[in-house]
Curated annotation (Swiss-Prot):
Name of this chain's protein: Tyrosine recombinase XerD-like
Positions of the catalytic residues: 154, 204, 236 (o-(3'-phospho-dna)-tyrosine intermediate)
GO function term, MF aspect, one: tyrosine-based site-specific recombinase activity
Known function: Putative tyrosine recombinase. Not involved in the cutting and rejoining of the recombining DNA molecules on dif(SL) site.
InterPro entries per record: CB, DNA_brk_join_enz, Integrase-like_cat_sf, Integrase_catalytic, Integrase_recombinase_N, Tyrosine_recombinase_XerD-like
Domain of life: Bacteria
Residues spanning the signal sequence: none
Gene: ynbA
Length: 238
């Protein structure tokens, strides 16, 4: 029995975000290519598992999960006459010991009355996961205070990030933000350092940790951060 190509139909049946859809498409096209000259059997699925064993454990688990969901879809739609499932990769103790789980911080001091540019920068990084390069490209008009969202454009791709009320009530009265956004990276770095000993990288990581805690999938988080791959995020999901 051959593996039928129902990738487009499968993706159309799922309510995926554009980024998640793209990642599923990539994984399933790779699976389809592997079975191009092979029959769909338990033995060949094991060979597929061996082929991807050089990837990180997180990447292996993602690909196996994608394949298993697709195989279940095919069986439920009677495209195959047997339900196949690849056994998931087991996380070894050594991998658990090496997992990366920094402590989540709340930064209550960031949410006091706004007193300096560095505090505003810290809030932008903590609330939206922005880096200095992205902050420099911001315009005050990107903030929609009526509907509470921030629009960011990067490499021709727009992403829309929700604005929380605790951020809005502290910063929406600012009238000279564009002056700050136009400053050099060194200026932004210096102003942030005046306000807090935490670096922009450390604060941005806290944004990531809070999103993981909130239940965002690795693909959803990559979309929020404007990333084209999930490689740098895998350590937070091990």
């Amino acid at each position: 029995m051959k593996l039928p190509n129902e990738i487009d139909e499968y993706l159309a049946s799922r309510n995926f975000s554009e980024n998640t859809r793209s990642n599923y498409h990539y994984d399933l096209v790779s699976l389809q290519a592997f079975f191009e000259d092979k029959s769909l059997t338990t033995e060949n699925l094991e060979l597929y598992k061996i082929q991807i064993s050089n990837l990180s454990p997180a990447a292996q688990r993602r690909k196996i999960s994608s394949a298993n969901q697709y195989l279940l879809f095919l069986y439920q739609r009677q495209k195959v006459d047997q339900y196949f499932k690849i056994k998931q990769v087991v996380q070894k103790k050594s991998q658990t010991a090496q997992s990366y789980h920094p402590m989540i911080k709340e930064f209550p001091e960031f949410y006091g009355p706004l007193t300096c540019p560095g505090q505003f920068l810290a809030l932008l990084i903590l609330e939206f996961g922005l880096n200095f390069a992205e902050i420099q490209k911001l315009k005050w008009e990107n903030f929609n205070w009526n509907f509470k969202y921030l629009t960011i454009e990067k490499a021709g791709i727009k992403r829309v990030l929700p604005i929380r009320e605790k951020f809005a009530i502290r910063v929406k009265a600012i009238n000279n933000a564009d002056e700050l956004f136009a400053k050099s990276r060194q200026f932004l770095y210096t102003e942030l350092k005046k306000f807090t000993n935490y670096s922009s990288k450390e604060i941005r990581e806290q944004y990531i940790l809070h999103q993981v805690k909130a239940g965002k999938s690795i693909y959803e988080l990559a979309t929020l951060l404007g990333l084209t791959t999930i490689t740098t995020l895998e350590k937070y999901y091990r």
